[in-house]
């Protein structure tokens, strides 16, 4: 019986850890091409607020403007 209980402890700990990590990561959005959006960081702050950050992900071509911002409280985390 003790062994069965201990095998459930680790999965429960990992589920709780992943739930907490997902809440702290925030939300992400793609605004468009860095060739069109010249100031990615400024555009993200304008659209999502002063706590937002933006970077141009140069994965190919002109790159993609990626925004990171705090998730609204009413958004569900799944």
UniProtKB/Swiss-Prot annotation:
It comes from the Eukaryota. It is found in: Secreted. Keywords: Antimicrobial, Disulfide bond, Fungicide, Plant defense, Secreted, Signal. Residues 1-23 form the signal peptide. GO terms for cellular component: extracellular region. Disulfide bonds join 27-71, 34-56, 40-65, 44-67. PANTHER family: DEFENSIN-LIKE PROTEIN 171-RELATED, DEFENSIN-LIKE PROTEIN 183. Belongs to the DEFL family. This is Putative defensin-like protein 170. It comes from Arabidopsis thaliana. The gene is LCR62.
